[in-house]
Amino acid sequence: MRHGLYRGITMSVAGSDSGGGAGIQADLKTFAALKVFGTTAITAVTVQNSMGVTGVHPIPPNVIEAQILAVGTDFHVDAVKTGMLGSRDAVCAVASGLGKLGKCALIADPVMVAQSGDPLIEDDAVDALLEKLIPMASLVTPNIPEAERLSGISIADVSDMERAAEEIAKAGCGAVLVKGGHLHDGSRTVTDVLMIDGAIIHFTDSRIDTESNHGTGCTLSSAIAAEMASGRDILEAVTFARRYLRACLINGIKCGHGAGCLAHAVKMDWVDELYA
């Protein structure tokens, strides 16, 4: 739904990254770049920079749900993305809060491990994702390790990605996008696998060699949310969001001593032409 200069209203339910490369910081930058109005419900405050995570401070579950309801009962939220949730109680609080809102697109990014390798979720929260949140989702966007954990399938190639997507879809979500960036099979290409309406769609692109890759999953899921908030269907939203992510990666920047960050402010033609 159009709101003045904005193409829609979005909500990020995720953790805060003090380094600014991932989490709600990446989400809000993405929302701004793609001209949607961004709101948030913070699930945790992480102490991190480009070199790693040194602390995770969860927000109480009742406060997480209260944030969701504060925004959702006032704004007409067109799309929600979830990211780092951390615990079973947090997952249940998010599912409860979102269940009380009106119908909107839900993109569930099942964040489990930080780019640095630090764990961001408790074991029992994975079951809660499958039981409580994923059945509510329009789209789930796991990377390879997350897809393996959600599906119980070891992934070594694209056919395994397809099987994992099919298994995750059994939880009741609308669609599954298994991201192939973690699949290092010697190929110079990367394939993402989308399962939607019983069909399998492959997105294959050349691999971008860059160390400026912190926050790629957050950025992709928030870009999909932005495009769905503007009225695109899942296939269109994934297609346009992947274009945006690649542009962010190609123009990535080195801010600290560790992994570099994406260039979220990159200009995209389909957005700019709306305001010419």
Positions of the model-derived regions?
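Acidic-glycine-rich active-site phosphate/pyrophosphate-binding loop
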Residues: M1-Y6, G23, R188-F203
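Conserved N-terminal subdomain of the carbohydrate kinase-like
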Residues: R2-S12, A32-P119
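Charged C-terminal helix
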Residues: R7, P58, L235-A276
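N-terminal phosphate-binding or glycine-rich loops at protein starts, especially the Walker A/P-loop
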Residues: I9-A33, V238
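Short pre-catalytic strand/loop immediately N-terminal to key active-site residues, enriched for Gly-Thr
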Residues: V13-G19, I200-H214
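Short, small-residue alpha-helix embedded
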Residues: T30, E148-R149, T210-I234
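Phosphate-handling active-site elements
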Residues: L34-T39, I200-I201, E227-A241
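Conserved phosphate/ATP/ADP-binding segment of small-molecule kinases
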Residues: D123-I200
